């Protein structure tokens, strides 16, 4: 392909990512190899032109386009200067250090040394190979697609790949079935038949002439990490464990404060974000924090966050979000999503990101603590409920389950609100979930039931033959308990495919870089070395993190039901979003889309609007699916 045509196509792809990098743009082509690399820059480190990309290594062998941060780049630079003084590192960016590290150590040995979040493409001019690399936990996204007529395209978002005329928009219906179950598409699937996600902790190697065959190399294996941690368990007591966790987190936060632009933090008032902010205030007296407050009492964490901020001495900003503000954001969310994604908490995450971006360019987030340290209700209550249910004959469990599922969810919600005795949001949904759990036939079945939005997605997605697995690993770690098996599944699937995807898309939509210190890979390894009792005990999760935070804040501030940025989607779909819902999921519109069974959708709408069941998760999944399909012209 002529260099001009090749470059023109990559330019169109590059501009689809302008929101991810508004500060600069670059293009590099190798016409002989038919390879072009494009980049949009969000300037964080070395704001000069020395940090511009694509960037070439000191040897001239490698060219890179890089998204993310190598937080320990200063230490690596010093080490390189000591062992390879002849290797010149241009400028002060972590990208330049990355390239020098690959020059000196090779890719795999360099990756072992990196502490960070990253997705990058590395072109080897000598071997004529392209390597696509994604960080250990999947914090940064990276996609690859086969193109009609030959060749491949890659990008941080599928929207950029879709700008290439050779991209096929055919739906992967098996992946869509899994999406309806989990509200996100499990890696490596994407929702498109010809596109994949690069899996966390791996890199793909593609060779010329057509780069069509990709070989996957695992450089960070979560199974090996967990098994290795269990082989060398932490031997100290809970106080010693809390001190070691604090040491690791303190260094993780310190590294993530390195920036040439202003840095702040999201603060919901919960354990995770409060821990991050507390450690930030030890490193700086000038910490800015951001939260949103809601008109809905059940979802308003504004006062809680403000109390934490006051005690920690941060410069705190609260955005009080009206119903109109949030509903307006609903209309903008589909343009941020390049694959089906149904986690409605992306709406408040986008709103708090928008507010933060007016003051800072980088924000630290508390995401990841739940998956590592047993913070979800399923980790705390799931094993207990399973053991208790096994003492009851199956026929009796099924009978009780049917009775619970007949209770109208909306009625339970209203009664709970009037009595004020429920410490959980949406008690009707929780009662119905309990009814479904009583039908579970195994511990694994219970976990799937806890995560499922649509319980029988193969009956809903037209043409789907089987669901793709939530985690396609060839083997599982030798885990000691039901709770730990759920935590592992959450770490390798729910965390990258849902939580981190949400944070990346919501923050990058407004050109804000979000950093997640709780899932530094050193913290991950330590967390898995801890005995379960330090994570979950006496129906309380994240015990070790509570102990750590208790040294800084009064227990009453965080010893309460789980908080976070949320919205009353169930009520909105019956109220101000009712017409939007009916329009998006009108039977004729669903039928014309050709992806799902119209009657199944209509029945779900009826159950929710009548108040017989709380189906807001399932319905929002379906709205997001149709918005995605219409935006990309999916068939």
Question: What residue spans do the PLM features occupy?
Answer:
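Active-site adenylate/phosphate-handling loop in enzymes that bind or generate adenylated species
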Residues: 351-411, 494, 499, 503-523
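Cysteine-centered catalytic environments shared across enzyme families
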Residues: 1-337, 349, 353, 550-551, ...
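Residues that scaffold the ATP/ADP-binding catalytic core of kinase and kinase-like folds
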Residues: 79, 164, 372-375, 526
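Short low-complexity, flexible loop/linker segments enriched in glycine and/or proline
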Residues: 331-335, 357, 379-381, 572-574
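Glycine-rich loop motifs involved in handling phospho/adenylate chemistry
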Residues: 263-272, 296-297, 344-347, 372, ...
């Amino acid at each position: 392909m002529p260099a001009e045509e090749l470059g023109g196509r990559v330019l169109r792809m590059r501009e689809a990512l302008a929101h991810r990098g508004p500060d600069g743009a670059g293009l590099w082509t190798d016409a002989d190899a038919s390879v072009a690399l494009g980049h949009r820059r969000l300037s964080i480190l070395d704001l000069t032109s020395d940090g511009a990309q694509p960037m070439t290594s000191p040897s001239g062998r490698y060219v890179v386009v890089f998204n993310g941060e190598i937080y320990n780049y200063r230490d690596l630079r010093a080490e390189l200067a000591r062992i390879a003084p002849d290797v010149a590192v241009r400028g002060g960016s972590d990208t330049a250090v990355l390239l020098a590290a690959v020059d000196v150590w090779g890719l795999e040995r360099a990756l072992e040394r990196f502490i960070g979040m990253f997705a990058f493409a590395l072109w080897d001019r000598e071997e004529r190979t392209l390597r696509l690399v994604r960080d250990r936990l999947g914090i940064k996204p990276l996609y690859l697609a086969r193109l009609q007529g030959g060749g491949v395209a890659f990008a941080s978002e599928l929207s950029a790949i879709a700008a290439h005329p050779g991209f096929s928009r055919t739906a992967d219906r098996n992946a869509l079935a899994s999406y309806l179950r989990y509200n996100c598409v499990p890696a490596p699937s994407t929702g498109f038949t010809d596109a994949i996600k690069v899996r966390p902790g791996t890199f793909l190697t593609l060779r010329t002439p057509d780069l069509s065959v990709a070989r996957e190399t695992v450089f960070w294996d979560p199974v090996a990490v967990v098994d290795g941690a269990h082989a060398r368990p932490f031997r100290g007591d809970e106080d010693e464990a809390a001190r070691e966790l604090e040491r690791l987190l303190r260094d993780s936060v310190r590294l993530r404060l390195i920036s040439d632009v202003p840095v702040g933090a999201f603060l919901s008032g919960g354990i995770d974000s409060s821990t991050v902010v507390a450690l930030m205030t030890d490193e700086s007296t000038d910490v800015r924090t951001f939260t949103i407050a809601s008109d809905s009492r059940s979802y308003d964490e504004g006062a809680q966050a403000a109390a934490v901020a006051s005690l920690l001495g941060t410069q705190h900003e609260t955005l009080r979000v009206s119903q109109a503000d949030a509903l307006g954001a609903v209309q903008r969310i589909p343009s941020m999503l390049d694959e089906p994604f149904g986690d409605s908490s992306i709406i408040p995450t986008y709103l708090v990101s928008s507010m933060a971006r007016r003051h800072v360019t980088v924000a630290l987030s508390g995401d990841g603590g739940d998956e590592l340290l047993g913070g979800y209700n399923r980790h705390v209550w799931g094993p207990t409920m399973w053991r208790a249910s096994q003492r009851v004959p199956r026929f009796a469990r099924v009978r009780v389950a049917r009775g619970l599922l007949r209770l109208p969810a909306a009625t339970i919600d209203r009664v709970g609100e009037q009595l004020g005795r429920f410490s959980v949001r949406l008690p009707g949904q929780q009662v119905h979930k309990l009814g479904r759990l009583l039908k579970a036939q195994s511990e694994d079945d219970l976990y799937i039931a806890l995560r499922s939005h649509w319980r029988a997605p193969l009956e809903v997605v037209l043409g789907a033959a089987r669901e793709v697995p939530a985690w396609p690993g060839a083997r599982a770690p030798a885990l000691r308990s039901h709770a730990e098996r759920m935590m592992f599944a959450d770490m390798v699937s729910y965390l990258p495919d849902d939580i981190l995807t949400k944070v990346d898309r919501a923050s990058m939509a407004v050109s804000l870089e979000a950093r997640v210190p709780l899932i530094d890979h050193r913290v991950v390894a330590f967390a898995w070395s801890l005995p379960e009792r330090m994570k979950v005990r006496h129906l309380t999760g994240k015990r070790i993190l509570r102990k750590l935070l208790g040294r800084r804040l009064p227990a009453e501030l965080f010893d309460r039901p789980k908080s976070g940025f949320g919205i009353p989607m169930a009520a909105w779909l019956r109220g101000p979003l009712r017409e939007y819902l009916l329009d998006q999921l009108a039977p004729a519109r669903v039928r014309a889309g050709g992806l799902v069974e119209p009657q199944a959708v209509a029945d779900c709408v009826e159950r929710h609007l009548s108040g017989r069941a709380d189906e807001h998760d399932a319905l929002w999944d379906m709205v997001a699916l149709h918005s995605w399909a219409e935006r990309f012209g999916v068939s």
